[in-house]
Amino acid sequence: MAKIVKVIGREIIDSRGNPTVEAEVHLEGGFVGLAAAPSGASTGSREALELRDGDKSRFLGKGVLKAVAAVNNEIAQAIVGKDATNQAEIDQIMIDLDGTENKSNFGANAILAVSLANAKAAAASKGLPLYAYIAELNGTAGVYSMPLPMMNIINGGEHADNNVDIQEFMIQPVGAKTLREALRIGAEVFHNLAKVLKSKGMSTAVGDEGGFAPNLASNADALACIKEAVEKAGYVLGKDVTLAMDCASSEFYNKENGMYEMKGEGKSFTSQEFTHYLEELTKQYPIVSIEDGQDESDWEGFAYQTKVLGDRVQLVGDDLFVTNTKILKEGIEKGIANSILIKFNQIGSLTETLAAIKMAKDAGYTAVISHRSGETEDATIADLAVGTAAGQIKTGSMSRSDRIAKYNQLIRIEEALERAGTPAAFPGLKAVKGQA
């Protein structure tokens, strides 16, 4: 038995200068797990609640002392003495103790930090790397794959202080044979994009996720700049590198008139018109994945978009599904989208996260493991991506240590598996729904 002997919570700082929750779980034998909760900027309305103090005299109201107190008191008292290797039991104890549908009593930030720290401590007690332990929890022990990165190299929307409406323009180094090669390709395109933007007199300041945040005349301009950067780096767009977008459509959807209002371009679209706007972009550029291409509440619009684009484009639900199996189940039944974005803190525990990944895979949907715009040095999502063989990861651009921490952990994992004589496959374009 890997007995929990101590649980510690503390307030630390994330990549946006806001507080977040970090937890330590200590076991008999001296094993310790340490984990921190991330935080989103564009959030789905049905996400589990991130508990903030609301005290304007401290961190502008964004302190997390209440969530930390829950870790140090109620949660600690409930799980000390329990077996850390019973992950589902530990998570359920916290969920039941919280007693709310959206974890608003303790906060998903408190529960998640403890959930992940517990898994890390349990893995250490078994002498396993975290990715291997996650595979065991997932019922897929020994089954790994390296994820295809979706690298956000131009930031807009809520992730940047610019006029670009679409939140993320991403590259996928699909021509790579290994994760390490994919990162090299991504880095080379990133640096060439800086040169392209500078040559046009544009800003090379970066947004929350490490991508550039220039003011551009249109979303098509962003894609054109990336195309030029890919070619300058010596790669072929559509063969070596493909494109992906996160529209974060809920951020520019006007619920009063039902229109998608792209103020950066001075255009407004109905739901169906916006789908056809995106369809035109996919004809001009090799865009193989579109995330949140409609507002989270516009299920009719999503159904239409899936009908129009779903046979050839991966349509990822983020704000749409919020890593929630109840919502995902409904989406699967109604034929909404064909992929889910997986964010730990949208649901608030490792066990529930694994359940969402399994449900998606069982239904033929893909699962894209994702960071949040507010991150820390915690690299757990790298282990999650490998340990569930999810196939894809979204963890930012080729700058900012909070993003690079995840890529570096993936490098370590890939190397460790190679040294052990059990290399994990890198799936390339096959990982993307509709591209196999």
Swiss-Prot record:
EC number per UniProt: 4.2.1.11
Gene Ontology biological-process annotations: glycolytic process
GO cellular component labels: cell surface; extracellular region; phosphopyruvate hydratase complex
SUPFAM superfamilies for this protein: Enolase C-terminal domain-like, Enolase N-terminal domain-like
Pathway: Carbohydrate degradation; glycolysis; pyruvate from D-glyceraldehyde 3-phosphate: step 4/5
This protein's UniProt keywords: Cytoplasm, Glycolysis, Lyase, Magnesium, Metal-binding, Secreted
SMART domains on file: Enolase_C (SM01192), Enolase_N (SM01193)
Needed cofactors: Mg(2+)
Keyword field contains Isomerase: no
Taxonomic superkingdom: Bacteria
Top enzyme class: lyase
Residues that hold Mg(2+) according to the record: 246, 291, 318
Location of the active site: 209 (proton donor), 343 (proton acceptor)
CDD domains named among the record's database cross-references: enolase (cd03313)
Catalytic activity: (2R)-2-phosphoglycerate = phosphoenolpyruvate + H2O
Presence of the UniProt keyword Cytoplasm in the record: yes
Cofactor remark from the record: Binds a second Mg(2+) ion via substrate during catalysis.
Localization: Cytoplasm; Secreted; Cell surface
Chief localisation class: cytoplasm
Task of the protein: Catalyzes the reversible conversion of 2-phosphoglycerate (2-PG) into phosphoenolpyruvate (PEP). It is essential for the degradation of carbohydrates via glycolysis.
Assigned protein family: Belongs to the enolase family.
NCBIfam families per UniProt: eno
Assembly information from the UniProt record: Component of the RNA degradosome, a multiprotein complex involved in RNA processing and mRNA degradation.
PANTHER family with a match to the protein in the record: ENOLASE
UniProt-recorded name of the protein: Enolase
Organism, as annotated: Haemophilus influenzae (strain 86-028NP)
